[in-house]
Amino acid sequence: MIAFGLGAQTTRSVWDGVYSEDQAKRGSELYAKQCASCHGAELTGGESAPALVGDAFLSNWNGTTVGDLFERIRKSMPQDDPGKLSRQQNADILAFIFSANKFPVGKTDLDRETEVLKLIKFETK
């Protein structure tokens, strides 16, 4: 296993396999229970919630960090009870969203700490 120094981490992006397959599976189950009623089973959005897949989603978050998206989810979702999910649950849901957007899977779970997630750039190709 390669250990990344702080400098190396700053160059990571969502295209570098920042979540695991198992984490995305956990996130899929959580998403179905906590998010799908507003964002849709296929993550395509609804009347009161934006899509979490596709060009509009990607361009909306392009140029930010994974930490920015994580904090948005952590503080404002689920809409009927913001902040009720744990950091781990939010990270798992985010891994599922990344999987649905076809970002490459990695070998380790996406971190649940905002400071670490801010070192991962959200960018389109």
Question: Which residues make up each language-model segment?
Answer:
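Bacterial N-terminal signal peptides
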Residues: 1-5
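Electrostatic cytochrome c docking/interface patches
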Residues: 9-30
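Flexible coil segments in periplasmic/lumen-exposed cytochrome c-class electron-transfer proteins
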Residues: 12, 80-125
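The canonical Cys-X-X-Cys-His
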Residues: 27, 31-42, 93, 97
